[in-house]
């Protein structure tokens, strides 16, 4: 009987210790429950760093020429990508049926930052600066989507695979451009004029706003 009780106690201890191990945070993903409450300025900067190579081709290399992107995105021009000169000559060239531009991971990541960054213990100056970068990236990504697709769905919050908003229709180009310009205005307010080398500044946001204004003005003409 005594041996049975000892075995039972040992088994209980193993079960309790196993629960502690199962409750540990994943090492390869950001936990929304704890990341933002402990994210210092360096962590916010690293979060922003994810979007520089995604949206700014050749970022960090003043001599970079992204030839692959120039070729693969030729479908955006009147000279559609062809397998050879003969395909154009004999009218056999066809449009690409798919591409990676209809992707919403950047928008989702930006919305997650904007929804949670105020929880960070970083200084208000750092929080505003990095929020300005994220606002710029969200506006820039949407600007590119409008240039490619026209009407697109506008999302203001991070969604998961079960969110019903994933199945919403496209918002009109006019509505989306108004939201883009509003986002850029907030980025201009948050971003400093002088930044580290290769980081988004207020002047970059002003340039993006000018490009957005051109689209709005052209559409109204």
Name the predicted role of every residue range.
Residues 146-147, 153, 195, 215-220:
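Short coil/turn linking the two alpha-helices of tandem helical-hairpin repeats
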Residues 62-79, 153, 199:
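Short, solvent-exposed turn/loop segments enriched in Gly/Ser/Thr/Pro and often Arg
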Residues 19-66, 174:
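Acidic, glycine-rich segments characteristic of secretory precursors and extracytoplasmic regions
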Residues 135, 206-212:
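TPR/Sel1-like alpha-solenoid repeat signature
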Residues 1-28:
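Bacterial Sec-dependent N-terminal signal peptides
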Residues 28-32, 90-91, 157-165:
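Short linear capping/connector segments at secondary-structure termini
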Residues 151, 155, 198-205:
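Aromatic-lined, polymer-binding surfaces characteristic
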Residues 41-45, 50-57, 79-149, 165-178, ...:
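Conserved, well-structured interaction surfaces
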């Amino acid at each position: 009987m005594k041996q049975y009780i000892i075995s039972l106690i040992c088994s209980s201890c193993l079960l309790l210790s196993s629960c502690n191990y199962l409750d540990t945070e994943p090492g390869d993903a950001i936990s929304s429950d704890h990341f933002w409450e402990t994210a210092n300025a360096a962590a916010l900067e690293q979060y922003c760093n994810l979007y520089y190579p995604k949206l700014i081709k050749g970022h960090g290399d003043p001599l970079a020429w992204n030839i692959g992107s120039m070729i693969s995105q030729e479908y955006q021009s009147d000279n559609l990508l062809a397998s050879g000169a003969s395909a154009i000559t004999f009218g056999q060239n066809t449009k690409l049926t798919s591409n990676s531009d209809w992707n919403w991971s950047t928008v989702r990541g930006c919305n997650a930052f904007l929804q949670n960054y105020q929880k960070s213990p970083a200084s208000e100056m750092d929080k505003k600066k990095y929020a300005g970068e994220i606002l710029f990236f969200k506006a820039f990504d949407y600007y590119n989507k409008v240039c490619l697709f026209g009407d697109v769905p506008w999302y203001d919050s991070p969604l998961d695979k079960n969110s019903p908003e994933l199945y919403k229709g496209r918002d009109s180009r006019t509505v989306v451009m108004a939201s883009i310009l509003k986002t850029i205005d907030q980025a201009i307010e948050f971003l400093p004029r002088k930044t580290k080398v290769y980081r988004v500044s207020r002047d970059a946001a002003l340039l993006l706003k000018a490009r957005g204004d051109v689209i709005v003005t052209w559409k109204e003409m």
